[in-house]
Design a protein with these regions (language model features):
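Feature recognizes metal-dependent phosphohydrolase scaffolds
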Residues: 1-650
Length: 650
């Protein structure tokens, strides 16, 4: 061990070859430890709603407005502060409007630049100069650094800053400078972003959200059930491919696949129009508002039915191939009496709402027709060979996982599978039993195998496991006894649609259970929390996102308009800054145009979950622990230099 430690110190001495350099680094790191911790922003359940997501990202769930309030307090009217905040969110668009209304743009530029500089100073104050420098736009890096850095040696600071601002306006770079300052404020306001699941689902722009996240300065992702579904589809898993297309068709968003990812759906469309030519497909109507022509709508509905039937067949094959999944009860096609148009479920007969199944052979209901097989082969190749989709999924794999422990918070989407008594449920995965953290880790390992395993069998298991995670009752990302897709389409009886939730959801107020979950993931003591995405909080019914005395924070971003009628709000986001935890409840997002024109913001109400007595500093964070280890190693190196065990390289 001593030899290993000495070799490590020798390697460290190559980076810090002198006492002076090692000492300077210790001083620098110690200074960083004393800075306030950076602001963390938690978003979840974005569901493809790009506009609302982009707005929340720009305003930091109210963090930008709080900075404006902190800087200007009562010296500026609420209306002016909101106008300044809107400018920071949408600098280009806001300036286009101002130019139409303002008579003296030079004065407006001057006032606005001074205000933005003050906000930028406040926002940058919690970071090292080095970190701020890395965030500066190249074109204006030097000038911005001059403007936001205090210069004690200047006797006439006002004159110095005035000259810089006047020059910016004189050379007609004010607009570009305002944009640069606004984007810098946005970036510095949030130090790190957590996406607690479900970038994908029913909304029209998940691919745009992924592009945005790939440009974000610091982000991690906890996969949601819909994210896993898309990952499985990208890996070529047929059950996942069929589900992805069905959900896009159901919400009138097939253009995500066709335009966003360039996946050719023409063979499916041709097949659907041929096989269901005279079928109104009434059970497969589109959800949400769409702007289709009658002809386009008819085609989407027929495609919706065609891919749904293919899905039920393909899933039947997966279930038969994987008896260990214990999902035989979800194979329903062989229970249909095709002559009578009924189905037998749990000994009870139900009449089907749709009785037209031209592609199902009653003797072999799970066998794809030659045309269906050809369609699935083409789709499988299309998903596997789509460069943009593969790039997005690699990003999810690189930045994501099923859970994350970060600064004493446990982040995950969905639930921890529990028994009725609150103990952790034992789940069998390919012959071995797992529970709690081990279950998460083995499932995540299979997801990665589905993309990267060299052995064909392991790769196939990994792909099938992504489909399992999407809809199995023992999956942490699903947590219900069944996914009643077939019943919702074909049966009128609501009792057949019921999906019973895992006991986890009814035990979130049980402190013993919550503490056992936190302990399972290595967390104990004060100021520890579970941040849980996936479940909409029905605020209009008096439901609270704060559970178990503040130990559990159930946040669903509520970006999906479909849930907003149920919940009464547009969901919650969470901010964790140096002063504590703040939950923000959002009003529904009207539009980007309304946000710019009216200055309307979607954050409506903030709830302080926990206010810390002493301001949290970097030394209190995970980064702080790593920096302390680095300081300790450097102090060992200094000791080795001073004792003569290692010689300085001067």
């Amino acid at each position: 061990m001593e030899d290993l430690k000495f070799k490590y110190l020798e390697r460290l001495s190559e980076i810090y070859p002198t006492i002076a350099q090692a000492s300077t680094e210790v001083i620098n790191l110690q200074a960083i430890l004393n800075l306030p911790k950076g602001t963390e922003h938690f978003l979840t359940d974005i569901h493809g709603e790009y506009e609302a997501f982009a707005h929340v990202l720009k305003n930091g769930s109210g963090s930008v407005r709080r900075k404006v309030d902190a800087v200007f307090g009562n010296t500026m009217s609420s209306r002016d502060k909101q106008a300044l905040a809107t400018l920071i969110y949408y600098p280009r668009e806001k300036m286009d409007r101002v130019k139409k209304e303002e008579n003296n743009m030079e004065d407006w530029y001057k006032i606005t630049l001074y205000r933005l500089i003050e906000v930028c100073k406040r926002t940058a104050s919690k970071y090292t100069r080095s970190k701020v420098r890395k965030a500066l736009p190249k074109d204006f890096a030097y000038v911005i650094e001059e403007l936001i850095t205090e210069k004690a040696e200047l006797t006439d600071k006002e004159s110095y800053y005035n000259e810089i601002v006047n020059t910016i306006i004189r050379v007609r770079r004010a607009e570009e400078f305002i944009i640069a300052l606004s984007e810098l404020i946005q970036r510095l306001t949030v130090d790190h972003l957590h996406i607690v699941g479900d970038i994908y689902d029913r909304g029209p722009g998940p691919h745009i959200i992924m592009d945005k996240l790939m440009q974000y300065h610091s982000v991690d992702i906890q996969w949601g059930n819909h994210d896993i579904l898309w990952m499985g589809a990208a890996a070529g898993q047929r059950g996942c491919i069929a589900n992805v297309i069905r959900i896009c068709a159901r919400y009138g968003n097939l253009d995500i696949l066709e335009d966003g990812y360039g996946i050719n759906l023409l063979p499916l469309a041709t097949f659907a129009l041929s096989k269901y030519a005279d079928d109104p497909c009434e059970c497969f109507g589109l959800k949400g508002s769409t702007s289709f022509t009658a002809q386009e709508k008819e085609m989407e509905i027929k495609m919706h039915k065609a891919i749904s039937i293919i899905q039920f067949k393909v899933e039947g094959q997966i279930i038969r191939k994987n008896p260990g999944f214990k999902m035989e009860g979800r194979n329903l096609l062989h229970r249909i009496d095709f002559e009578k148009g009924t189905i037998d479920l749990d000994g009870q007969k139900y009449e089907l709402l749709d009785k037209n199944f031209p592609t199902i052979d009653p003797r072999h209901p799970y066998t794809l027709t030659k045309e269906e097989e050809d369609i699935m082969e083409r789709l499988e190749r299309a998903f596997l060979n789509c460069e943009k989709l593969q790039e997005h999924m690699r990003f999810l794999l690189n930045k994501g996982g099923l859970y994350k422990v970060y600064n004493n918070n446990l982040l995950y989407h969905g639930c921890i599978p529990l028994n009725e008594d609150g103990s952790m449920k034992q789940v069998k995965i390919y012959g071995k039993t797992y529970k709690g953290k081990e279950l998460y880790e083995v499932l995540e390992s299979y997801v990665r195998k589905g993309f990267f395993a060299v052995e064909t069998k392991e790769k196939e298991r990994g792909r099938d496991m992504m489909w399992y995670i999407w809809l199995n009752e023992n999956s942490p990302l699903f947590g219900k006894d069944k996914m009643a897709t077939f019943e919702r389409y074909f049966l009128a009886e609501k009792e057949t649609h019921l999906e019973k939730k895992n006991p986890y959801y009814s035990l979130l107020e049980n402190e013993k259970v919550v503490d056992s979950i936190l302990a399972e993931f290595g967390l104990s003591g004060e100021c520890i929390h579970i941040v849980n995405g996936h479940v909409p909080v029905r605020s209009k019914n008096g439901e609270s996102p704060i559970k178990c005395g503040g130990k559990v924070l159930v946040i669903d971003g509520g970006f999906s308009k479909a849930y907003q009628k149920e919940t009464g709000i547009a969901g919650y986001t969470l901010i964790y800054n140096s002063y504590g935890l703040i939950l923000t409840a959002h009003d529904p997002f009207e539009s980007t145009e309304a946000a710019i024109e009216k200055g309307s913001d979607i954050h409506s109400d903030s709830i302080i979950v926990k206010r810390v007595m002493a301001r949290k500093r970097v030394e209190d964070t995970d980064d702080g622990k790593r920096l302390k280890e680095r300081i300790r190693d450097l102090e060992f190196l200094l000791e080795a230099y001073r004792s003569g065990r290692i010689t300085e390289k001067i």
